[in-house]
Amino acid sequence: MLYFLTGITASGKSDLAHKSAIENNMSILSVDSMAVYKGLDVLTAKPSDVMQAQVKYYGLDIADCDQNFSIIDYLNYLIDQDIPEKSFKEDILAVGGSGLYVKAMIDKYEFKPTDPTIRSELEQLNFDQLLKFHELNEIPIPDMELNKIDYISSSFERP
């Protein structure tokens, strides 16, 4: 079965998940969009080598820091690791704060690949230009994402 433990940054999710996984003989699936990157151990509060020896972890260190790793790549990783199938045979605790990763798993999102031409054009725009473009095209931006230029840029690439 697949269980979820989500919450805000620095709320103790990782420690609670690790303790729960040991007590309940579970594996852990990281749903942290930064933990996928190698070398960001301190920034993302990745489990230590000792912790990883105690519990099977998925979703850690699967991309280089200079690699563009998208939600599509993450979902493909889940399929490559047989996570959907494994969740029928074993208990897996998905833990992290990346809401899009969690929603994509629960709601079975399907994403279209990004268009590199559009992305290149959008990267030339500044923050105010992107906001104006959103307004003109009536593309909503959640209030909590208004300060994230990457979110605003990538929203033009989504269907």
What is the meaning of each model-derived region?
Residues 1-159:
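Phosphate/pyrophosphate-binding catalytic cores of soluble transferases and nucleic-acid-acting enzymes
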